[in-house]
Amino acid sequence: MARPLQRPAGLGPFVLLWLLLPAPSGRGVQAGRAWPVPRCPAACEPTRCPPLPRCSVGTAPVLDRCGCCRVCAAAEGEACGGPLGRPCAPGLQCLAPRAPRLLGGRPLGTCGCPAAGATVCGSDGRTYRSLCALRAENRAARLRGALPAVPVQKGDCGDPGTGSAGWLRNKFNFIASVVEKVAPSVVHLQLFRRDRSPLGSEDVPVSSASGFIVSEDGLIVTNAHVLTNQQRIQVELQSGVQYEATVKDVDHKLDLALIKIEPNADLPVLLLGKSSDLRAGEFVVALGSPFSLQNTVTAGIVSTTQRGGKELGLKDSDMDYIQTDAIINHGNSGGPLVNLDGDVIGINTLKVTAGISFAIPSDRIRQFLAEFHERQLKGKALSQKKYLGLRMLPLTMNLLQEMKRQDPEFPDVASGVFVHEVIQGTAAESSGLKDHDVIVSINGLPVTTTTDVIEAVKANDSLSLLVRRKSQTLILTVTPEIIN
């Protein structure tokens, strides 16, 4: 009887498992051999890093895959990846071939420029498919001892440097497009006063303002409060050309004025948009020349399109102002407030405090211009009007609290009209009125709104003002000017 075959003790089932596995050839074993990959140290110790070899020309040392030791980066066309994870030089990618080679069980690739990228123009006049391609060309140029090219602009060399229309800079720089369209029609106003002395007379600059062109033959809209009687008005265009201007129409209730210059050629004009279509939250741009700095631009959003005059304390006013947080400074008055289409939707008028500014809606400007043209057609002369020379606000509770916060010595009053600004060279300045005064009464009658002041000016040739200034109580006499 044949004895059963005995398997050696200790082999257990491993022999059977080995017998079930196919026997690989020697070549296959070598190709599938797993090379050990060094582990990254728990803590980086640069003192234990191997010496850095001399890197090839055009490449710089980079950190290894562990982020600890410096190694030579692979240049374009050199191998990358592998068991040690050799990195490519900055700007290059490790591109794996369709049939990747394996080293130590890890794929090997070749460093190269990424396929996608914006074209750039080099100083050598050549267009490169990407900034990476230009740098790669520079590395090759250094090896040849040639002069490397410098990137001079984005886009092709034939482009004027604006770049691709899809770039974020062009896509979202909508305000720059508005300014480019509007700025040529915004003008700077310089107002002069004639000072007479025994030695002669001279024109002294007293204030500056802004305006915008509404007709090709030189009609310009600005604020009424920036104009004073017997002043010379000089208008400077964006090109730097200067003209003398004459006043054509003034409406102090609307705070609008129309002046005229005689240009040598047609001027660029701004179109009036419909302020009634404006929505709260829209972007707006304010242009002007505050502090005589031409082409000053601020941007903001519309807080409300109908800040009623009655809400501001103007009980007899039917004006609805545009409130915005676009900055309006001294000298910015009279400049346009435009929407993103470049249409005028208001005229910059007043800044109450930081982040709160007001503009007269363009629908009122359109009405003002229509009435002027109607008078021109009928041949009516411009009537004479009285002018005090103030920018004022009703002293509401909110304004009183804000002024108390800014100036602890602000007068302790319950009502009145706040003098925001005294225009230089006017009757108001001659009377002794100053900025931040509070007019309490005129000719013995209390005033609480700007309309009260306007009606008093119309009805009287001489005004006796009861004024509070800090802790002082003053009585000032003023005679309004007569202007055309």
Curated annotation (Swiss-Prot):
Enzyme class name: hydrolase
Keywords: Disulfide bond, Hydrolase, Protease, Secreted, Serine protease, Signal
The gene coding this protein: HTRA4
SMART domains documented for this protein: IB, KAZAL, PDZ
EC number(s) given by UniProt: 3.4.21.-
One Gene Ontology molecular-function label: serine-type endopeptidase activity
UniProt-recorded name of the protein: Serine protease HTR4
Chain ranges of the IGFBP N-terminal domain: 36-114
CDD domains linked: cpPDZ_HtrA-like, KAZAL_FS
Start and end residues of each Kazal-like domain: 105-159
Domain PDZ: 390-472
Serine protease: region residues: 209-369
GO biological process: positive regulation of apoptotic process; programmed cell death; proteolysis
Superkingdom per UniProt: Eukaryota
Disulfide bridge map: C40-C66, C44-C68, C49-C69, C55-C72, C80-C94, C88-C111, C113-C132, C121-C157
UniProt cross-references to InterPro entries, sorted A to Z: Growth_fac_rcpt_cys_sf (IPR009030), IGFBP-like (IPR000867), Kazal_dom (IPR002350), Kazal_dom_sf (IPR036058), PDZ (IPR001478), PDZ_6 (IPR041489), PDZ_sf (IPR036034), Peptidase_S1_PA (IPR009003)
Localization terms from the record: Secreted
One Pfam family, short name: Trypsin_2
Role played: Serine protease.
Similarity-based family: Belongs to the peptidase S1C family.
A GO cellular-component term linked to this record: extracellular region
SUPFAM superfamilies: Growth factor receptor domain, Kazal-type serine protease inhibitors, PDZ domain-like, Trypsin-like serine proteases
Sections of the chain in a coiled coil: none
Location of the active site: H225 (charge relay system), D255 (charge relay system), S333 (charge relay system)
Signal peptide interval: 1-28
